[in-house]
UniProtKB/Swiss-Prot annotation:
Belongs to the bacterial ribosomal protein bL35 family. One of its GO terms (molecular function) is structural constituent of ribosome. The keyword Ribosomal protein applies. This is Large ribosomal subunit protein bL35m. It comes from the Eukaryota. SUPFAM superfamilies: L35p-like. One of its GO terms (cellular component) is mitochondrial large ribosomal subunit. PANTHER family: 39S RIBOSOMAL PROTEIN L35, MITOCHONDRIAL (PTHR15909), LARGE RIBOSOMAL SUBUNIT PROTEIN BL35M (PTHR15909:SF0). Its main location: mitochondrion. GO terms for biological process: translation. It is found in: Mitochondrion.
Amino acid sequence: MAASAFAGAVRAASGILRPLNILASSTYRNCVKNASLISALSTGRFSHIQTPVVSSTPRLPTSERNLTCGHTSVILNRVAPVLPSVLKLPVRSLTYFSARKGKRKTVKAVIYRFLRLHCGLWVRRKAGYKKKLWKKTPARKKRLREFVFCNKTQSKLLDKMTTSFWKRRNWYVDDPYQKYHDRTNLKV
């Protein structure tokens, strides 16, 4: 049972651990074969025969209850500290920075394509609103021209890609987004 859980955990990891998966599965198969052989030989019929069981794995446990092999537990103990670092997703705390001083820099494509409201939401056009317009119906073109909000993950990434200059409040004359900069009717 533990060996199958181990094999599942190794399969869930990336291709880095693939050689360990092959080793663990072959070791587990050898252990199961040897354990079934020991249980067959330990019956009353063969009690008078004293022949050692030949095994490809050294020091096979003789207990019938213990079906896990020694090598599997050793591999599990060696790989267990490595698994969290392998399975952890990479995090980019800062997306763009200067080479000389390491200061944050703004990705200009974000400034051109998105609008940040003062409440922290980002506004964008729908994807593909300028592409292949000849094959799209007028209704579909109208839907694509609409503005939509970015989700939480996108907003966090866009905040990392811009400096504090772009997060300050701006008071433009006749700003069409003036009524959207502050959130209202929020239950906190």
